[in-house]
Design a protein with these regions (language model features):
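N-terminal beta-alpha supersecondary unit
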Residues: 2-71
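Surface "functional belts" at beta-alpha junctions
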Residues: 3-8, 29, 41, 96-194, ...
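Residues at secondary-structure transition points
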Residues: 37-45, 76, 80, 84-87, ...
Length: 242
């Protein structure tokens, strides 16, 4: 089946935060979905979740037209699990495969049309160890346009890149609310924080229709910073060199 068909079968996989989920869509409309609870073990829950939505929809995995996965930033372990699963499905079964930035998925928790053309939103994600990830998006009235790519660094530095009056939300904005203040920005509530498998699938289908599918073996998780052990090793190496 062509991915331009409104009945294209699309699977969305989201494993970048401590919840996550999987959805099966017909076009952009959800058929079946499974959401994992707080503290989910993605390595344990993802494959049974995929089997559950496929079985509930009475299809075979081989009928999938698109597999979309949240590619990061996010939980290092969750990213590896989700991306590896998407690669496996793409390589063995042949659907179009695409990775979607986690912050873009979060942006669509806010409707571009409701914000109005020209409005800005900025999901801010806690990156641990005193950093945040963020991306600034501008509404075209129909979609969110990425203006900055992923910004990664101390919250004070990242906040300088966000236009005043932008709607900021996410666990990073909440954690560093002394930086992302209501005096400078509009602040969203916790209902906007989590990326969803549904928007992963919808954006994945749109990306594939625009020619953005990738070779499954080239799909990679996007971490945007080293792990804590890697940072410690880099620090020790730098100290030895001085």
């Amino acid at each position: 089946m062509s991915t331009t068909d409104e009945t294209a079968l699309v699977m969305g996989i989201e494993t970048t935060d401590d919840r996550g989920g999987v959805v099966l869509c017909c076009g952009e409309e959800p058929l079946e979905q499974r959401e994992f609870g707080p503290g989910a073990s993605h390595a344990r829950d993802l494959l049974p979740g995929i089997d559950a939505v496929v079985r509930a929809a009475d299809i075979q995995k081989s009928e999938l037209d698109v597999v979309a996965v949240a590619e990061g930033p996010g939980s290092f372990t969750g990213l590896r699990v989700g991306v590896t699963c998407a690669k496996m499905l793409g390589y063995t079964l042949g659907p179009a495969v695409v990775g979607i930035p986690t912050l873009e998925i979060k942006a669509y928790n806010v409707e571009p049309a409701e914000e109005g053309s020209g409005a800005h939103v900025c999901p801010v994600q806690d990156a641990r160890r005193g950093w945040v990830y963020a991306t600034v998006f501008r509404s075209t009235g129909e979609r969110w346009k990425d203006l900055t790519g992923v910004l990664a660094g101390p919250p004070e530095d990242v906040a300088q890149e966000v236009p005043e009056g932008a709607l900021v939300f996410g666990d990073g904005a909440e954690k560093f609310n002394d930086v992302f203040t209501p005096e400078r920005f509009r602040t969203g509530d916790e209902s906007l924080d989590d990326p969803t498998a549904l928007w992963t699938a919808r954006l994945g289908l749109r990306r594939v229709r625009a020619g953005g599918a990738v070779d499954p073996m080239e799909l990679q998780p996007r971490y945007y910073r080293p792990t804590a052990p890697e940072e410690n090793l880099q620090r020790r190496s730098a100290q030895k060199g001085n």
